[in-house]
Amino acid sequence: MHHSFLSANGGVVMSKKTAHGLRLKHLGIKTYHEAIIYMREDCHVCHSEGFEVQTRIQVTLGQHSIIATLNVVTSELLAPGEAGLSDYAWDALHAKEGDEIQVSHPKPLESLSYVHTKIYGNELSYEQMKVIIDDVLSGRLSDVQISAFLAASSAGRLTRTEIMKLTKAMIDSGDRLSWSSPLVVDKHCVGGLPGNRTTLIVVPIVAAFGLMIPKTSSRAITSPAGTADTMETLAPVHLSPQKMRQVVEQENGCIVWGGAVSLSPADDVLIRVERAIDLDSEGQLVASILSKKIATGATHAVIDIPVGPTAKVRNQSMALLLKQSLEEVGNELGLVVHTILTDGSQPVGHGIGPSLEARDVMSVLQGLPDAPNDLRERALTLAGAALECSSKVQPGLGKSIAKQILESGKAFKKFQAICEAQGGMRELTKARFTHPVVAAKEGKVSLIDNRKLAKIAKLAGAPKSKSAGIDLHAHVGESVEQGEPLFTIHSESSGELNYACDLLRDKQDIIILGENS
């Protein structure tokens, strides 16, 4: 790589070569989405360029170029003249063993100066937001730099206008779907509530009515199952954009993994960094939800906000603030948003974990006598709100129409058709190991800690092991006898079952029993 500049007489003068060549060795190190370059401590390039640990380095291979963070190797893992890359960087450069890469100092980042602007409390323009989001997506900003932007944008530091600009920048960073129908409905749940798997019931009800509902869902980020994980136990969810379109045009709806279609891709990077610093900011949450809905091509969105002490939204005032933001920013960007505040005090249904949640969904769709009523009622409320987006449905009548579609068996028939169109319906699997957890005394269930219950389900192997998780037998307000099962842990391996049981011994207050009144 040469830098050139004009001499006084107008001729081009080549500066000395500032990029250095190193031979690639495949190390097979996974860093998730972070680009890392590994170089020897005594590497001649490190010395001549002044590269130190954590330096950001421009790495070029043929037509591909990325910015990676330097990690220094002090062992014989690399031979002199060799460099290694994290798997993410290796794939981004389309690298092969023995390829020669060029390394150099990157140009100063304009986006970083805009991050500083935000840190000092100034408002950002759409253009500045767009530069930041583009650099997030291309990997030019490191995770540390992204976390500085997220922190500077949290705790109400983004104005309503900035949230709108950020949302727009995130939409513009990826693809945007368009559909043959003038009315396209979407639904979303803000989250934090185990077992709240209403999507798999809402989509077939709305599609059976005749409205278009192309649903892209996420896999679990910190929960025991995401909607895509649960759906995957029943049908393929990894569909190309072309296949997704085919399913929707044929059946009016789909339930697919959003990661396979490039909608608001910068959001996935921001969520990953937010998770690492355990940060949930209202502005980012609004931009995240709305950018995904608008990129999907939705004209109307129904958003479920569960409110409870151990849900994502902990109290009514937070919920109302979020509701107002979602509706106002959505309106500015041409999306009609209906928000519904729901009870987030305890898990929904009986199952927590992909297969167990799918079992609950199937029992509701099939109208079985043991179907969880709370899951059914929530799904009907949300489906009713979605149906009322249509001028054919009078306000207030949506839920009863949704109920008719569910009880007639049309929703189950539509769900089967969607599964077939996505690649074929699958049989649910059962876990090999189970362990019941019983009540130490008689009493009435007064509190269930969603977060601790979700943690046990994850230790048992969910969502990676599809059949792992928890089967909840007691809900808030129900009386139990001493020795009666409160919940059963399901696991694919005895080792994971033991992990989950170990946590139980540490955390006795997962389900709190009060006196029977």
UniProtKB/Swiss-Prot annotation:
Gene Ontology terms describing biological process: pyrimidine nucleobase metabolic process; pyrimidine nucleoside metabolic process
HAMAP family: Thymid_phosp_2
EC number: 2.4.2.4
EC supergroup of this enzyme: transferase
Pfam families for this protein: Glycos_trans_3N, Glycos_transf_3, PYNP_C
Organism: Legionella pneumophila (strain Corby)
GO cellular component, one term: cytosol
NCBIfam families cross-referenced by the UniProt entry: ARCH_P_rylase, PRK04350.1
GO MF: 1,4-alpha-oligoglucan phosphorylase activity; thymidine phosphorylase activity
Protein name as it appears in the record: Putative thymidine phosphorylase
Annotated catalysed reactions: thymidine + phosphate = 2-deoxy-alpha-D-ribose 1-phosphate + thymine
PANTHER family found in the cross-reference section: THYMIDINE PHOSPHORYLASE
UniProt keywords, alphabetically: Glycosyltransferase, Transferase
Similarity comment text for this entry: Belongs to the thymidine/pyrimidine-nucleoside phosphorylase family. Type 2 subfamily.
InterPro entries xrefs: Glycosyl_Trfase_fam3 (IPR000312), Glycosyl_Trfase_fam3_N_dom (IPR017459), Glycosyl_Trfase_fam3_N_dom_sf (IPR036320), Nuc_phospho_transferase (IPR035902), PYNP-like_C_sf (IPR036566), PYNP_C (IPR013102), Pyrmidine_PPase_CS (IPR017872), Thym_Pase_Put (IPR028579)
